[in-house]
Design a protein with these regions (language model features):
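Helix-loop boundary and gating motifs at the non-cytosolic
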Residues: 30-117, 122, 126, 136-140, ...
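Juxtamembrane intracellular "pre-TM" segments in multi-pass secondary transporters
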Residues: 30-49, 269-303, 483-486
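Loop-to-transmembrane helix entry/capping segments in MFS-fold secondary transporters
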Residues: 101-102, 194-204, 331-332, 416-427
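Helix-to-loop junctions at the C-terminal end of transmembrane segments
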Residues: 118-131, 223, 347-360, 445
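Structural signature of the two symmetry-related core transmembrane helices
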Residues: 134-150, 363-378, 458
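Helix-loop junctions at membrane interfaces in 12-TM secondary transporters
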Residues: 152-169, 380-391
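Intracellular juxtamembrane helix-capping segments at the cytosolic ends
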Residues: 177-192, 401-415
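Helix-loop junctions on the cytosolic side of multi-pass membrane transporters
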Residues: 245, 260-277, 469-482
Length: 486
């Protein structure tokens, strides 16, 4: 029996009935979306203690280890020593161009160059996923492998091969750190409410910084000491060099790996109500202008961030300038200034975190820039160990405030679905300047001296300060007024 309804008997809906049906479907969709948002919020608060502990342990142990590598003392000094003794194979003309200062700048630039592209590629691979933890663990593991490679290179290589290996591992470290930063910050943004992010970062950085400051001093004074690299000994038929820098890097690898393990075991990640559809990297790059036009505050924030990072061209040369002025670049000197830098970084975290939670991170961003300018001026005026100690303390506090403020402010602009790509674009802009900055700084130092590098740095920080004061509104205030979606 044919039950097909003849065309002339098919009921035709009036425009009013169609509108009512669409309105009903829209209301149902909005109800489902509201229910999903409520479930998402309930999951976050129900698992807050566990996720808080996971982020705390990961930050305390992970950042402790990374600070041993990223402190403006060990790696610049190590590269300077290697470049001073490992460039003999070059022709005389090239040796004049490849000065130790230029090699220091090149090494720090290579560490940053990976962050130019890898954040966007990483974000494109995770923004469509409801769970990003597996990608975070993979990127974190690959990042730590590079630090292990730096350690083994120092034990088994010497001279030019060791210098080349260090430059390679610094490049790979930057490559994986760019993608890791996006993934881990995205997890933080998903599991920790914005009203708790400041104090979490404050306490994890504070406790981790205490450990890092103590380890930095101990590594400089006792592990590296006065003779960081010695003649090889034989172990299992292999020639192994005693290298205090390698031992320090291996210690950093162990600490960061413990933090990553704790994070993987404890974290509980929710499924967000909405995610972006998967898109090609080229399509996301074409979407950058639209993303910036849709949020003027974020666009100017990225400009300010770029200028602030450009001001870091001087960072690798702080310790070299202090060593040249004091006529000492010994392990003890590295340990003392590393202690000042990381100690102030540690102590100031409580200020930055609680200030950010209470007033928003725009205020801490501004104060950090003022600290940076003041610390650089003090460094220029210093001629004694106590004065340099104070200058490194100011610079450490500034670095801490900038990192916490910039990374947290990015999470508070715009829509949640765009968070991964905002992190990626922000990291890429930072990576461009971070990769070019030390290289340009090294060339300036080789041609015009350290002071010109410092004056250039101050100029960029002043520009960043002006942009934030006059062009960037506190994103949390806009969110509370309903201009952006949570």
């Amino acid at each position: 029996m044919d039950e097909t309804v003849p065309p002339n008997e098919i009921p035709v809906l009036s425009e009013i009935e169609v509108a009512e049906l669409a309105s009903s479907e829209t209301a149902t969709s909005e109800t489902d979306q509201a229910r999903s948002e409520a479930e998402y919020e309930r999951f976050i608060w129900a698992n807050l203690k566990r996720n808080y502990a996971a982020n705390y342990l990961h930050g305390m142990l992970g950042m402790t280890g990374f600070r041993l590598v990223n402190a403006p003392t060990f790696v610049p000094a190590y590269l300077y020593i290697l470049a001073s003794h490992g460039l003999g194979f070059l022709p005389a003309g090239l040796r004049m161009l490849a000065s130790p200062n230029a090699i220091v700048g090149l090494g720090l630039s290579l560490q940053q160059v990976g962050q130019v592209i890898s954040p966007i590629i990483g974000a494109a691979q995770i923004e469509h996923r409801k769970r990003v933890l597996p990608a975070s663990i993979l990127m974190g593991t690959l990042m730590r492998v590079q630090i292990l490679g730096m350690a083994f290179a120092g034990w088994f290589f010497s001279g030019a091969p060791l210098l080349v290996a260090m430059l390679f591992f610094l490049l790979m470290l930057g490559l994986f750190s760019g993608a890791q930063r996006v993934a881990f910050q995205l997890v933080l943004g998903k599991v920790i409410p914005f009203s708790r992010r400041g104090r979490l970062q404050a306490w994890r950085n504070f406790t981790g910084g205490i450990i890092a400051a103590a380890l930095t001093y101990a590594a400089g004074r006792y592990i590296i000491g006065g003779g960081p690299i010695s003649i090889p000994s034989h172990f299992l038929g292999l020639s192994v060099f005693k290298n205090g820098y390698s031992t320090t890097f291996f210690l950093a690898f162990v600490l960061t790996s413990l933090g990553l393990t704790a994070f993987q075991l404890l974290i509980r990640e929710p499924d967000p109500p909405k995610v972006r559809p998967r898109m090609r990297v080229s399509d996301r790059l074409r979407g950058l202008p639209a993303l910036l036009r849709s949020d003027r505050g974020f666009a100017f924030f990225m400009l300010a961030q770029t200028c602030a990072v450009a001001g870091r061209i001087a960072a690798p040369f702080y310790i070299l300038y202090a060593g040249a002025t004091l006529h000492s670049l010994s392990g003890a000197t590295l340990g003392i200034f590393g202690l000042a830098n990381l100690g102030a970084d540690t102590a100031s975290n409580l200020l930055w975190g609680y200030l950010g939670d209470k007033s928003g991170f725009r205020s801490s961003f501004l104060i950090a820039l003022l600290f940076w300018i003041g610390g650089t001026v003090l460094l220029i005026l210093s001629h004694t160990m106590p004065a340099f100690f104070l200058a490194f303390a100011f610079l450490g506090a500034a670095s801490s405030g900038y990192q916490m403020s910039s990374q947290t402010m990015v999470l508070e602009f715009g829509l949640r679905e765009d968070m991964a790509m905002r992190l990626a674009f922000s990291s890429t802009a930072e990576g461009v300047m971070s990769s070019l900055g030390p290289l340009i700084g090294g060339l300036i130092a080789a041609v015009a001296g350290y002071l010109m590098v410092f004056y250039t740095s101050i100029g960029f920080e002043v520009v960043a300060l002006g942009i934030v004061i006059f062009m960037v509104e506190e994103p949390r205030k806009r969110r509370m007024l309903g201009f952006t979606s949570p």
